[in-house]
Amino acid sequence: MGSTREFSFGIRLFLKAYPWRKIHPVPWTPLTKPLAECTVALGTSAGLSASGQPPFDDHVRGGDPTFRILPASTEVATLQENHRSTVFDHSGLHRDRNLAFPLDRLRELAATRRIGAVAPQHLSFMGSQTAPGRLVKETAPAAAARLRADKVDVAVLIPVCPVCNQTVALVAAELERQGIATVCLMLLREVAERVRPPRALCVPFRHGYPLGQPDDPAGQTRVLEAAFYVLENEPGPAPVLRELRSGYPPPPEPATIEVPED
């Protein structure tokens, strides 16, 4: 998974000293129906905005706390990225927006009936928010209300930078308070342990590459399937923290083939 070794000594010192915001108590919304009947939304911290929307403002002290709504009809390749952090590699995201906003993968999963439906609207944040007060008090509740209005059942939240790990966790907590089951991909296990999102899957990739590699639909789908495994098979109590690694999720059981008797 991601590691602080990716970063300069100065950034490592900052991350060590930073007062991570612990979620307490940890809210929990159980998954009460099969994913094949669920409406699923995405939340990205990559600072993505659609054509005609204002970009995120990289001059806001502590990070731009606003959010953007990305419609399900969005062409992923046309999204603009305005993430202020310079500590992670943006090149993969420039090549394939699905690395942080896998809307194309979600459409494919809906087409095969793995999920019930793609939500009509999705959430975009600029996740490098070192002062998350407004995010917690204003932005996350407003964003959650938008998904509730769309009758969203499940949200998958995706970070790209070190502080993004905290941002998606804080948003997930508010979504859970408002009755939406969530799972966060996490790039730093130590942040997941300190902040405590309701459900987290630590992924073995560096920052900027939360779903693996660009232009790798099969690999990106495997990551989403692992996130869905956490939702479907980890009943709590919260917080649930798992790692995507060899043996987890376990391979599917082979189908039983009935051989007719002679």
Range-by-range predicted roles:
Residues M1-D262:
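Metallocofactor- and cofactor-centric catalytic cores in central/energy metabolism, strongly enriched
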